[in-house]
Amino acid sequence: MSLWINGEWTTGQGEALEKRDPVGSGLLWQGHAADDAQVQAACAAARAAFPAWAKRPFADRQAIAEKFAALLEANKTELTRIIALETSKPRWEAATEVTAMINKVGISLKAYQTRTGEQHSPMPDGAATLRHRPHGVLAVFGPYNFPGHLPNGHIVPALLAGNTLVFKPSELTPHTGEAVMKLWEQAGLPAGVLNLVQGARATGQALSARPELDGLLFTGSAGTGYQLHRQLAGQPEKILALEMGGNNPLIVEDPDDIDGAVHLAIQSAFITAGQRCTCARRLLVKRGAAGDAFLARLVEIAGRLRPDRWDAEPQPFMGGLISAQAAERVLEAWQGHLSRGGKPLLTPALVQAGSSLLTPGIIELTGVRDVPDEEVFGPLLGVWRYDDFDEAITLANATRYGLSCGLISPVREKFDQLLLEARAGIVNWNKPLTGAASTAPFGGVGASGNHRPSAWYAADYCAWPMASLESPTFALPQTLNPGLDFSGKEQA
């Protein structure tokens, strides 16, 4: 039984689903998708549970979220294993994901109070008060690259705000979604407050079309995000939060520490096997001896990376991609770059046939025409050379996306210029593109999404503001507006 609807585990009535080990192809999980009737039942359960949940004291909702965090800590080893197996990321990295899930509860509590709590402003004859109210029933669509952490970043703040939810994890990581839901169950969530529906595209389309929804929180590809935007067009009453991908540039300008710069580039491009939305896809390197030395060292160090199983010892830097099919798509993109005239610097290769273990690829694309402005979700890095910093910024902004952008340079003035001219939601200096602060907003512009539905600003998407002018008493003003006459006796 893989669905959790109205406080009960049940078997899906839709198509059969299974999850296999991306590296070894062994069966990890099997179940069935929710059919349309079960999606409707999940939304109806969330709608029925909303009034009571929204009216519960905030302290009650906080206590359940904190119990969930404690359960994550108690079950960290097992949840780490499940995430690592499903995604094929190394154990060390899966463990950091669970830690991020635990920390998200405290961060969300602080963000709720800071960004969406009550604010009172005194007035001469009363007070102005800002309060926030939950939207109602929200759908949460989770991605596969961080199947615990990223949906958690929507679920926790949404529940704290008083919303009820229907959660659809990625069909590529159903086991993680089920395992996390069982911890919420143990934390004591009332029936219907959080519901789980498994499934692929058909389930997602059925869920996003439900009239019971007051909003949808999505993390995933730009293609799916655009489809959801079209589907909800003409429904301004529904909140739609889209956190999508990026074709992210990393500029390298005369680094004074070659190995330090190479380390930042590898962390930016190849961590999580290149499956982070903030990963560097385009490396912009200044022409000259320093740039040549940097590139040569990058190719050398990246060539030493050996992807391996999640539980291999010693632990690898990279695991595999989410599936063998995903690895093949990266290789197809590589071949496309070659066919357009790209110069291979480091050729990617499968560690074993039929596996998702793929070594990094680096290809120079300077002067190559018609390079697709698409996010290749894997360990593939394109290189462009430039002559001056203005050209670098022009290249960096030459994308429909706008998620992350970074600069490796000892010169602060270069970063100041980039801050003014970059079109990206995250702009880092001498830090990995994949680095983000939990106390800062996360998101981008353009095809990367509608601004900041994640991290510190997630609370903004989970509640709407209510403004009030308040006074415990009232009386006839001494000075009246023109045309008002209160003279004579009071009318009986």
Curated annotation (Swiss-Prot):
Residues annotated as binding NAD(+): 220-225
GO BP: any one term: arginine catabolic process to succinate
Coiled-coil region list: none
Class of enzymatic activity (EC top level): oxidoreductase
GO molecular function: succinylglutamate-semialdehyde dehydrogenase activity
EC number, UniProt record: 1.2.1.71
Catalytic activity: N-succinyl-L-glutamate 5-semialdehyde + NAD(+) + H2O = N-succinyl-L-glutamate + NADH + 2 H(+)
InterPro entries assigned to the protein according to its UniProt record, in alphabetical order: Ald_DH/histidinol_DH, Ald_DH_C, Ald_DH_CS_CYS, Ald_DH_CS_GLU, Ald_DH_N, Aldehyde_DH_dom, SuccinylGlu_semiald_DH_AstD
Protein keywords: Arginine metabolism, NAD, Oxidoreductase
Pathway noted in the entry: Amino-acid degradation; L-arginine degradation via AST pathway; L-glutamate and succinate from L-arginine: step 4/5
Pfam families: Aldedh
Active-site residues, record numbering mapped to chain: 243, 277
Domain of life where this protein originates: Bacteria
HAMAP family linked to this entry: Aldedh_AstD (MF_01174)
Function, in words: Catalyzes the NAD-dependent reduction of succinylglutamate semialdehyde into succinylglutamate.
Family: Belongs to the aldehyde dehydrogenase family. AstD subfamily.
Protein name (database record): N-succinylglutamate 5-semialdehyde dehydrogenase
Species assigned in the record: Cronobacter sakazakii (strain ATCC BAA-894)
Lineage: Bacteria, Pseudomonadati, Pseudomonadota, Gammaproteobacteria, Enterobacterales
